Curated annotation (Swiss-Prot):
Chain ranges of the Helicase ATP-binding domain: 228-395
EC numbers for this chain: 5.6.2.4
GO MF annotation: an example: 3'-5' DNA helicase activity
Enzyme class label: isomerase
SMART domains xref list: DEXDc (SM00487), HELICc (SM00490)
Keywords: ATP-binding, DNA replication, DNA-binding, Helicase, Hydrolase, Isomerase, Metal-binding, Nucleotide-binding, Primosome, Zinc
Co-factor(s): Zn(2+)
Protein name: Replication restart protein PriA
Reaction catalysed by this enzyme: Couples ATP hydrolysis with the unwinding of duplex DNA by translocating in the 3'-5' direction; ATP + H2O = ADP + phosphate + H(+)
Annotated organism of origin: Chlamydia muridarum (strain MoPn / Nigg)
Pfam family, one: DEAD
Cofactor binding mode and count: Binds 2 zinc ions per subunit.
Length: 753
């Protein structure tokens, strides 16, 4: 029968996972009437004739017995997730996110469905080779076999501190794939899809601590949060605890309390990288009740966990920001660990939500207790706690097993005067690393630039090589022998023979340093040192981050070198030295959050040292030893930093005293993009609420990215929803050219890049 003439007894109002901002009516076929309920996930057509792979996912919002479009209505094609319905708190959250973050309802819905979300987030797969037996047994195997190629492979794996792909191992040992196949069949090696490292329990073994004796501050925090759980009233608690103060132990105890009350739990961590270490700890205590959810899982893994949580078979979900959208039965507790972290802000695809704030709103919709934990709270959260909007629990001392860490500042101006040249490592740092190597203790070195050389120029005219598609200087990556753009990933692997500026024969000069060079220098200083480098180059494949962390945690390397990802919640009991090579680099960025982010980063890095019975030391190298942000970070004095920073925020009317809306215009023609931005700016100026203020248009910090030019302006307001409505009216009136795209970012974490 032609669906345009089909009649139905019942109709459903549904929200479709497409880039549309309205609710549509569909007919409910007779065979689905008993199975479709409010919150059901269904499949619907958006066009008259569709194939099975063209159906869209949708959520049923309302069931009714009539429709204004009954004559042309199409039927629901089927139920996608049988027996699973989205709870009311999630449906309310969809509408709130859409309104607040200025995003169509259909695009917002994609966050909440596992299949749709996984289709928009892809990742790379890679196999890694591991020993099939422990080191002692492998040594015995080497003595028992005669094939020199097999022996070479096993010896290489015994020595390596980094996961190797089959291709890398074949190249390093000069063997064929048959050798690897033979060793694998005998059980002497394992060839594992790196993705599986994230879900195999046997891979989740780290140093397991003895149950600690709780401090009085921990007991008070646990009691405060437990009382909130018992009353079943929405409450947000800021758990402000210095690094090593035992916030995780507080999480453990309140999760136990929530489970004893029959309530489920969501625990957010900033990045997938932290999920495995956190999962290991909580699986040890709660076993099969715990599930992990993030975009790097396969579609089937993600969907399976989502279904189990929706049915109450998993009651504790751990994951990065996307885990906040998991349907849970009787959700009673939401924990946002490292709540200050910028990774909670989605920046790649709309809606550009802040998961910390979404967590608070979900807690409100479901009457749950929300914990925001950090050693360096965001200024917004700390202000909310001081104003009593949130309750405040403070852990001011390190846990009883921790010895206070010694923190020292190294003035690199003086070091350069002594050496009369630029140096990356001061003598003090070299001596301190040497002392750790001598006694078998570990060191973490933080340097927030990747690659080998960060500046490559013509030796004749000094022209610096830039990306042809962006206004970004190219970085030399020695491992791959390429020049790489860190904005658009353009790779130049062929030698450059003539200078684009002077057209002379190109002789390159290399300057600047990244983590690759830091690793190379350390190996020059200490030829026998075992290093692991942790940055986006070494962790691009699924599971590679976890494999590297496991190697370091089990003592297979002496020094961990990395970018900001090493600052986030890692727990390594054998680390007694943390080094910040360039403590002031982030302060040169013209962004209102720059000082806050530098303070947070230095404080978090220093917290990686001395987390067990061994005394820790932190060394911070800087060219700005008198800078107050660095001084406060050196003293680990967040209240003093807050007191100073909040004065500047208030004087300039920046968050937390207002909220920001950032409108970014992108187009291939710089002049035309600016014209459209000016036209939109004028329309908004005419209609803007008197309580809001409109800032001038300016080029973005990265003006050209992927051949698109970027302009922006900011709106300051206390009422986002009101201004969003005025923005929508302005967009409707402006009818922007299809050649220019506008991105609206609510509560941006940066106003520069």
């Amino acid at each position: 029968m032609d669906p345009t003439h089909q009649s139905f007894r019942l109709y459903a109002e549904v929200l479709v996972s497409a880039n549309i901002n309205k609710i549509l009516d569909y007919g409910i076929p007779a065979e689905l009437e008993d199975r479709v309920t409010i919150g059901s996930v269904v499949k619907v057509p958006l066009q008259r004739k569709v194939t099975n792979d063209k159906y869209k996912f949708a959520i049923v919002l309302k069931i009714k017995d009539s429709s204004d479009f009954a004559n042309v209505i199409q039927p629901i094609a089927g139920i996608s997730y049988e027996g699973v319905t989205l709870p009311k708190d999630l449906i309310d959250l969809i509408f709130w996110i859409s309104q607040y973050y200025f995003c169509p309802l259909g695009s917002t819905l994609s966050l909440f469905l596992p299949t749709v979300y996984s289709q928009t987030h892809s990742t790379k797969h890679q196999n890694n080779v591991f020993l099939g037996q422990n080191a002692e047994r492998t040594q015995e195997i080497i003595k028992s076999i005669e094939d020199p190629h097999q022996i070479a492979v096993l010896r290489k794996l015994l020595k390596t501190t980094k996961p190797l792909t089959p291709k890398e191992l074949i190249k390093k040992t000069d063997i064929s794939t048959k050798i690897l196949d033979s060793l694998s069949k005998q059980g002497f090696i394992r060839i594992v899809d790196s993705a599986n490292l994230e879900i195999q329990d046997e891979q989740l073994q780290y140093f397991l601590p003895e149950p600690p004796t709780l401090t009085q501050e921990q007991i008070e925090a646990i009691n405060t949060i437990s009382q909130s759980l018992i009353t079943t009233k929405f409450q947000t608690c800021l758990l402000f605890g210095v690094t090593g103060s035992g916030k995780t132990e507080v999480y453990l105890q309140v999760i136990r309390k929530a489970r004893s009350l029959g309530k489920s739990v969501i625990l957010l961590v900033p990045e997938v990288a932290l999920t495995i270490q956190t999962l290991s700890f909580f699986k040890m205590h709660f076993g099969a009740e715990v599930g992990v959810l993030h975009y790097k899982l396969s579609e089937s893994e993600r969907t399976q966990t989502w279904h189990k949580a929706a049915r109450g078979l998993i009651n504790i979900i751990i994951g990065p920001r996307s885990a906040i959208f998991c349907p849970m039965q009787n959700l009673g507790l939401i924990i946002v660990d490292e709540e200050h972290d910028g990774a909670y802000k989605q920046s790649d695809l709309p809606p550009f939500y802040q998961a910390r704030d979404v967590a608070v709103m979900r807690g409100k919709f479901t009457n749950a207790t929300v914990i925001l934990g950090s050693a360096t709270p965001s200024l917004e959260s700390y202000t909310n706690a001081l104003s009593k909007k949130y309750t405040l629990s403070v852990l001011s001392k390190r846990a009883s097993t921790s010895i206070p860490t010694k923190v020292s500042l190294i003035d690199m101006n003086r070091e350069m005067e002594k050496t009369r040249k630029k140096i990356l490592f001061s003598p003090t740092v070299i001596r301190s690393i040497e002392q750790r190597l001598a006694v078998g203790e570990q060191t973490i070195i933080f340097f927030n630039r990747r690659g080998f050389h960060t500046n490559v120029s013509c030796s004749s005219c000094k022209y610096t090589l830039k990306c042809p598609h962006c206004d970004m200087i190219l970085t030399f990556h020695k491992t791959e022998r390429i020049l790489l753009c860190h904005l658009c990933n353009t790779r130049l692997s062929k030698p450059i023979t003539s200078c684009p500026q002077c057209h002379g024969t190109m002789t390159l000069q290399y300057r600047g340093a990244g983590t690759e060079k830091i690793e190379a220098l350390l190996q020059d200083f200490f030829p026998t040192v075992r290093t692991i480098r942790l940055d986006s180059d070494t962790t691009r494949y699924r599971g590679s981050h976890d494999a590297l962390i496991k190697q370091f945690a089990t003592g297979k390397a002496d020094i961990l070198i990395g970018t900001q990802m090493i600052a986030k919640g890692m727990h390594f009991p054998a680390v007694t030295l943390s080094v910040v090579l360039s403590g002031d680099s982030g302060l040169y960025i013209p962004d209102f959050r720059a000082a806050e982010q530098v303070f947070q980063l230095i404080t978090q890095v220093t917290g990686r040292s001395g987390r067990s019975y061994l005394p820790g030391e932190v060394l911070i190298q800087t060219f700005l030893p008198q800078n107050s942000t660095i001084s406060h970070a050196l003293a680990q004095d967040f209240p003093a930093f807050y007191k100073e920073e909040i004065l500047g925020r208030k004087a300039c009317n920046y968050p937390p005293f207002t909220r920001l809306i950032r409108c970014i215009f992108l187009g291939k023609c710089a002049e035309y993009t600016l014209q459209e931005a000016q036209r939109m700016h004028e329309l908004i100026k005419q209609n803007l609420d008197a309580q809001a203020s409109l800032m001038d248009i300016s080029p973005c910090g990265h003006f050209k990215v992927k051949d698109l030019f970027h302009y922006q302006f900011l709106i300051k307001t206390r009422n986002i929803l009101t201004v969003n409505k005025q923005l929508q009216d302005a967009f409707s009136a402006a009818k922007l050219s299809s050649k220019v795209r506008c991105i609206v970012d609510i509560d941006p974490i940066t106003t520069f890049f």
